[in-house]
Amino acid sequence: MYIHHLALRDFRNYRRQDVALSPTTILLYGPNAAGKTSLLEAIFYLATTRSPRLSSDRDLVRWDAVGEAGAPPFARIAADVERRIGPVRLEILVQRRLDDGGQPLNGAQKLVRIDKRPARAIDLIGQLRVVLFTPTDVMLVDGPPAERRRYLDITLSQLDPHYVRTLAYYQKILLQRNSLLRAWREQRRLPRNVDAELGYWDQELAAAGGYLLAERLRAVVELSALAGSIYRKISGGEHELQIEYIASCDLDAARDAGSLAERLRLAFAAQRTDELARGQTLCGPHRDDLVFNVAGVNLGRYGSRGQQRTIALALKIGEAELMQQRGGDAPVLLLDDVLSELDNRRRMHLLDLILRPQQQTLLTATNLSDFSADFLAAARRFRVEDGQLFAG
């Protein structure tokens, strides 16, 4: 899988940009704030419909963009993608929302097209599979559990259309169940038939949660094997990384979706009193976590910055291999400032891993001195200046 043509309009600091891309390694270099990271962000957004950097899509639209015929300004990302199952053209427009006086409102409107036909945003996910690494991804290792759950969800949503839809349904039911629990707590009065009132929500949440758990547990086993050996190669050490899934409910030995759903339903019933007192659902996929161990040591808690960054890199490259094994196509690998904070040995091992056949990789750097002559000869280069790409 690779992007052979990318077009941007009024996205971040890009006014207009059309570029043909090769299916190999592409190096984007130039000064800070030139637009290197924004180009990776555009590709990630097209693949996942979300920005890795912003909570509000309206800020994706270039600040001085002008709309047409009085319409609000918009950003446009379009790509022609080659895949094993056949080519596809993907397009997404992000349009600012304005009030009657022309002043910007919160949020933005998304318009999606697949092969020039209107589509839902959720249908875009998985059409183009990407793996993104940024300097802040060390938070996958030492940050809050929500970062690790989000990582698993983005990975699996790209691989499995049913996962992304089940996740959306789970989140909807969770919100409704929590609203009910919170309302009862605030009223300080419970209905006579609490179990009957919650029975439907318990059943629906458990069924959706069981599927999410089954897919997560399966993926963690595969990722642990893939990222484990990659960690050893990058670090040059003797020990492999081991990834452990920490469930917030007692799952016992359950691993299939049906058995996991039953374990969740039992957990909800067992925690009924505590949930009513606190006004929230206390266990389930929305409260789970991952732990990263090397030689029995939790490096999320006790690892050095270099070790944690190496884990994050190994996790991302392992994710790319998982996508290739499961989907038959290697995803597009997006590496932003990947060499910072790595010593020379780790850099050498990492660059050897990046230069792989049938793998389109886009990586950014501020200069070329960090790369070997062999790497520079093998990679296609673009100099990035003020939102423009120049070959060479």
Curated annotation (Swiss-Prot):
Molecular-function annotations in GO: ATP binding; ATP hydrolysis activity; single-stranded DNA binding
Keywords recorded for this protein, A-Z: ATP-binding, Cytoplasm, DNA damage, DNA repair, DNA replication, DNA-binding, Nucleotide-binding, SOS response
| Compartment(s) | Cytoplasm
Question: What SMART domains does this protein's entry cite?
Answer: AAA
- Name one cellular component (GO) term: cytoplasm
Give the matching PROSITE patterns: RECF_1, RECF_2
The record's Gene3D superfamilies line, in alphabetical order, gives:
P-loop containing nucleotide triphosphate hydrolases, RecF/RecN/SMC, N-terminal domain
Q: Which residues bind ATP?
A: 30-37
Q: What InterPro entries does the database record attribute to this sequence?
A: AAA+_ATPase, DNA-binding_RecF, DNA-binding_RecF_CS, P-loop_NTPase, RecF/RecN/SMC_N, RecF_2
Please state the span of the N-terminal signal peptide per the UniProt entry. Answer: none
The main location class comes to cytoplasm
Q: Which GO terms describe its biological process?
A: DNA replication; DNA synthesis involved in DNA repair; double-strand break repair; SOS response
Alphabetized HAMAP family for the sequence: RecF
Describe the function of this protein. Answer: The RecF protein is involved in DNA metabolism; it is required for DNA replication and normal SOS inducibility. RecF binds preferentially to single-stranded, linear DNA. It also seems to bind ATP.
Family membership noted in the UniProt record: Belongs to the RecF family.
The name this protein carries in UniProt is DNA replication and repair protein RecF
